[in-house]
From Swiss-Prot:
One of its GO terms (biological process) is mitochondrial translation. Belongs to the universal ribosomal protein uL16 family. This is Large ribosomal subunit protein uL16c. The keyword Plastid applies. InterPro entries: Ribosomal_uL16, Ribosomal_uL16_bact-type, Ribosomal_uL16_CS, Ribosomal_uL16_dom, Ribosomal_uL16_sf. It comes from Phaseolus angularis (Azuki bean). NCBIfam families: rplP_bact (TIGR01164). One of its GO terms (molecular function) is rRNA binding. The keyword Ribosomal protein applies. Part of the 50S ribosomal subunit. It holds the Pfam family Ribosomal_L16. It is found in: Plastid, Chloroplast.
Length: 136
């Protein structure tokens, strides 16, 4: 269940820069517990899905999980052993641009110890340092 946009206005994007902190999506909105990013990074759709699966496997029934990031940036890759020039590569995979402070996952309907365990497993799937936070 890898997520990527169904259609975009343009097939390719500039790489851009990840400077500053996240001013949007940095508060807990849906659940009671959350995983917050502490570093800037590109997080691929595969990494997001791996974290979601790890959490849902731990929570079982009763708990709810919300994924607060969406991979909407295409990353292009050139074929190997290709000479310089002749245009930009083809879109290979999708990433979510994450800045420090951004909430990655939220969880509710479970005790704190279970949530802490599930979120720590999901954080090990992420390529960045994260922290567990509680609303309120």
């Amino acid at each position: 269940m890898l997520s990527n946009p169904q259609r975009t206005r343009f097939r390719k994007q500039h790489r851009g820069r990840m400077k500053g902190i996240s001013y949007r999506g940095n508060h807990i909105c849906f659940g009671r517990y959350a995983l917050q990013a502490l570093e800037p990074a590109w997080i691929t759709s595969r990494q997001i899905e791996a974290g979601r699966r790890a959490m849902s496997r731990n929570v079982r029934r009763g708990g709810q999980i919300w994924v607060r990031i969406f991979p909407d940036k295409p990353v292009t890759v050139r074929p190997t052993e290709t000479r310089m020039g002749s245009g930009k590569g083809f879109p290979e995979y999708w990433v979510a641009v994450v800045k420090p402070g951004k909430i990655l996952y939220e969880m509710g309907g479970v005790p704190e110890n279970i949530a802490r365990k599930a979120i720590s497993i999901a954080s090990s799937k992420m390529p960045i340092r994260t922290q567990f936070i509680i609303s309120g």
